[in-house]
Amino acid sequence: MQKIKEGYRRRHDYIIPKFISFQSGYLDFSFYQVSLKNVKYLDLSSYYQLHAPRRFRKIVEYLNLSYGQLLTLGTLPKYVMSLDLSSYNQLFTPGRLPIRVSLDLSSYNQLFTPGRLPDTVDYLKLSSYNQLFTPGTLPNHMVYLNLSSYNQPLTPGTLPNKVKYLVLSSYNQLLTPGTLPNNVKYVDLSSYNKLLTPETLPNKVKYLVLSSYDQLLTPGTLPNNVKCVDLSSYDKLLTPGTLPNNVKYVDLSSYNKLLTPRTLPNNVECLVLSSYNQLLTPGILPNYVKYLDISSYNQLLTPGTLSNNVEYLDLSSYNQVLAPKTIPNNVKCLDCPSYKQSLISETFPNRVGDLELSDHPKHVNDNWEIIKPQKNISENKVYYTTKHKNAKIIDVLNICKCSLKLYGYVKDRNNEFNIYFEYIDKAIPLSRLLEKLNKKEQFIVATEIIKSIKSIHEMGIIHFDIKCQNILILYDENEKMLPTDFIKIIGFDHSTLDSEVNSNIIGVTETHMAPEIKLKNGKLGYKSDIWSLGCTLIEIVGGNLKLLDINGIPLIPDHLSNLFKNTIQHCLQINPNARFNANELYNYVIKDSIMEPIEPIYLPNQCTNLPLFNEVIVPSGFFGIKYLELQAYNQPIDSIFIFNGVEYLILQSFNHPLGPGILPESIKYLKLPSFNHPLKEGSIPRSVIHLVFNKFNQFSLDEINLILPKFLDFGDAFDIEKYGILIPEDSILTLRTGFTFNQPINQRYIPSSVTDLQLYNYNLKILPHSIPRSIIMLTLGSNFTHFESLSNLPSSIINLTFGFKNNFKIAELKKYIPSHITSININGKIVNFKKSSPLNTFNQSTDNILNNNEHFKEDWEIISTLGSGNFGKVFKARKINGIINGSKVSLCAIKKIEKKDKLKIKLSTEVEILNKLKDNEHSMKYYGYGYDEDDNLFIYTEYIEGSTSISDLIKKKPNNRFEEEEIKSLMIKIVKALSKIHESGVIHRDIKSDHIILAQDKNNETIVKFIDFGLSKQIEKNSKYYSFVGTDSHMAPEVKLQNGKAGSKSDIFCIGCTMIEMAGLNLCHSERDDKGIPSIPTHLSNSFKNIIQNCLKFDTNARHSVESLIITLSNIQIEGDSVFEKYLSPNLKKLELKTNEPILLGSIGNEINYLSLPIYNQMITPGALPPSVQYLLFNKLNQYLECDSIPESVKYLDLGNEFDIEKNGINLSNESILVLRCGFNFTQPVSQRLLPYSVTDLQLYNYNINLKRNSIPTLVTSLTLGSNFTNIESLSFLPENVNSLAIGIKDEDEKLTKEIEKIIQTKKSITSFKINGIQRN
């Protein structure tokens, strides 16, 4: 800890990550002088004290805390969503826990009484609790409940009805109908052994654990929907109909009563009868069973007894003669260790890939003898190494088919080992074959690798360096992969025996290294190989091991099958105990469709893909996830299904109706490929920016009030000719559809707000006025041939994309392209009709300075250093003889790249880019390159005397900044120059003031030139760039995240940063928000602030394009900035502003503390309202509020009558708000999660429905309710702190008044009470 403090004092820009784990000691937050606003997951699992906890009250969402002292009010962060207090066992009092939290109290065993737990808790783990529960003790919203030690009587109503996942593994009290919640789907009653009657178990149960149950079961006792049942102790007679027809997994491990046909349901896929030894005849076992365990069976099997669908078969005790075809043909894995009968070739099917038999009397294999080493082994090739960790390992490997034979080893005179191995002529490292394997071969190789690692582990060996380079593939003489045993594992340099493993493993491949090896936490073992195996499988299928999620786990490629994805996912678990071992992994691959009940687990990962998930949903399982993909899920969902925090949601197979409020308001990207139900108002969250359908094809008049996102992709199915006229206006900016048009498009199909229209299957004529004038970018079909109709395009279009498949030459199309179109993409290529296409590859002629590409120092005079670029310095130099490339040009700019830096870049990068741009007037002319005698690289470009960089000009300016008019004038030239660079097919990727040069052309006009193309990239069709390159202070978010979205818009982000530079702000030391977006100088006009803001958008689709930025800069008016300009007076304190124009950044003075916006109803951009406002009043506002829309300074907030707090107020979490007024007409009981925790005066003057327990924040002292409040009994749920209450009733009902007064008398804390505005005693 002291080192952290000292490091912080040395460097004030110390960065706190989003995930913090402290492993021991005492945590003192007092040394942090920075905000912990980025910390989302905080692991304090070994800390035993807390000091200054308010330092992280607001920002931590996931807290793991080993804390045994009494919790006091305010100790825990207010907005924690998942809280691990697994060691806590002190008494809770109301208000000590956060208002909405997933809670782990594994050690807690103090008495709970009603009201001690927040009503919003939906995940509760009380695995040590064994005190009697009474009805109302547990919150009604509970979905996951773990009471694994509980064994007190339960009565109907004790458990919350919404519970879906229930663990009562110690419970053995009599259950009666209605005791278990009706909605429960997973029930663990491992210890239960009381008689069950029909209707005791709820009908919705799908997973049922009754592992101790041995009472007689009768038809109807088990629910009809059960899919998985554990009856591992059951040994009473089963009759037909006892087990439900839908069951797929049955564990009858102890059962040994005679089975008759139809006793077992035909749909069973996994059947465990490990004690069964009664005669089996054809028709007894289910026809669809795939996994069959009859490991005690030793009666004669005949052909037809076992189902043809069996793939995994355990016959561990079987030793009767096996006739041909007795074992089904589909069996892949067969366990027969007791079998000692004679074998013929037809005994086992050809598909059996894993066969375990006993030692056969005729089995002899002399090939496994160790041959003593000789001094010369001429007939074998020899591998030589200086490393040899343990000879015993190599001795053991001589009996393992998946490793090379060892011939021996000797020490030479230098005491180094010479190890002699088998050499196989037809063996190729897997790393050299990756691009040649098809999908089927990839899976076959993966299965064989798993099998080989299983063999190594069974011999007690841990490899520690599994990767493609250490795996050999064996081929036959025809260069075809051997049918079996074609894998050889090599590279045992780091290996150890299991009995000798230690935590100090060094030198293994970092990209494949398991977390426990990096952490040296003592958890090394066989599971470390499983992690490396997962990384190797990603290698095999073409994945990139450098692409990691927030926890450092490699991302699994999307194109894989569900089985392949799940196999890798079972390998790449942070916790070694959660990984499969090699045997489990091999069995999983062989019997991929076996269903097992999986307990919902805590997932802090921000990126989660559950390809096969289609069962019980537990919200706590999704806490912390920002990216959630469920490929197979197709069940109805409700509002608690997905945790509020998910930003990217993909429901690949989902096709059920969506109601208002079902999906959380945090979602920004929503993909519903299979969805085809009517959309209702509020069914698509307002936070969604990007919405993708594929099969959606309906719209009605009821949907015209929908607010749809800015980017909408309808896919191929949506009939835009039929429904297009009903699409809501004014919200969609980008519209994408693959509909195949039957007639020319009509502009009434397209909303007037759309600026980017993508009709990628439109190949018909374009009629006059058929495309709206709002369109700036247009994409047409891949076989568009009506070129003459392009003249009908509106003049607003500047970007056009289309394709064609006929014999037209692109050059012939020039006459059809309207002059207002500046960017053209044809068949995936950017076309420039104004100039001949630049050279495409570096291999073409480059007019180099020297034919042999050599650099001689004596030929050059270095005049001065111009600067340092990426990977090299740049010098101003003179050629001694005054001739460069045959011309009389003496001055030159030379970039020197050291040999060591040359390894970081490819020569073909900067040289090829410069060569490609040699005819582009906005880059320095390229002369050539050369190497000196030390192999340093020199790149020669034009030098223009008198030229200067933007950064040098900034230094010469007063206060080191340009005036706005100067920035505007220069930026128009800079962006136009950038458009020419992009037209040449190049993205710069490192634009900043240092790399922009101003020079004079022949006409003495200022011309912009870009330099330092060392990090540039050529634009290619369908390219996704993942490289982490550029200057950090100017780097776009998508480049830092390496998410494949980097492209030409990344240069626009750099332009925005450069404008900030020119305005006088040092980006290296500027403040940034949570997404890394730099702050904008406050002295700029609102118009300029908004231009920069639109360059710095996190979402690349929302960012300016080159074309739109040129237009916006050209139209900007520096003076008379906006209607708000007159309100910038620093002396103005109180302001009533009657306007409905969007409020721009900085448009309202920072001294205003009272702000009234009576008619305002626009989105409030975070930061638009001044940070000085304390009193904020609205009347017409009804827009979604983002996290920072309301300044932290606001103490009094009046939301007026229009604001729908149920839909738009989820982020209303300011701790500063003390008084909140809202006239919203609630349709359902208010929830604490909608109200600021800090409110003391709450005025809900149109609230006339019932109150629920814990629905009002505990700090509220003054409460105002509606004018027709009749739910009198619910007033008993008021918090204890309320001392002032005002309500209204109609018609002065005396009876109602007396009832109210009677309840108020029980609330001793209430000292002031009003009905209809009249004070009551």
Curated annotation (Swiss-Prot):
Pfam families: FNIP, Pkinase. Its EC number is 2.7.11.1. It catalyses: L-seryl-[protein] + ATP = O-phospho-L-seryl-[protein] + ADP + H(+); L-threonyl-[protein] + ATP = O-phospho-L-threonyl-[protein] + ADP + H(+). Its cofactor is Mg(2+). It is an enzyme of class 2 (transferase). The active site is at D465, D990. FNIP repeats lie at residues 108-149, 150-191, 192-233, 255-296, 654-696, 741-783, 1160-1202, 1224-1268. Keywords: ATP-binding, Kinase, Magnesium, Metal-binding, Nucleotide-binding, Repeat, Serine/threonine-protein kinase, Transferase. ATP binds at residues 301-309, 325, 866-874, 895. Residues 295-595, 860-1128 form the Protein kinase domain. SMART domains: S_TKc. GO terms for molecular function: ATP binding; metal ion binding; protein serine kinase activity; protein serine/threonine kinase activity. Belongs to the protein kinase superfamily. STE Ser/Thr protein kinase family. This is Probable serine/threonine-protein kinase fnkE. The gene is fnkE.
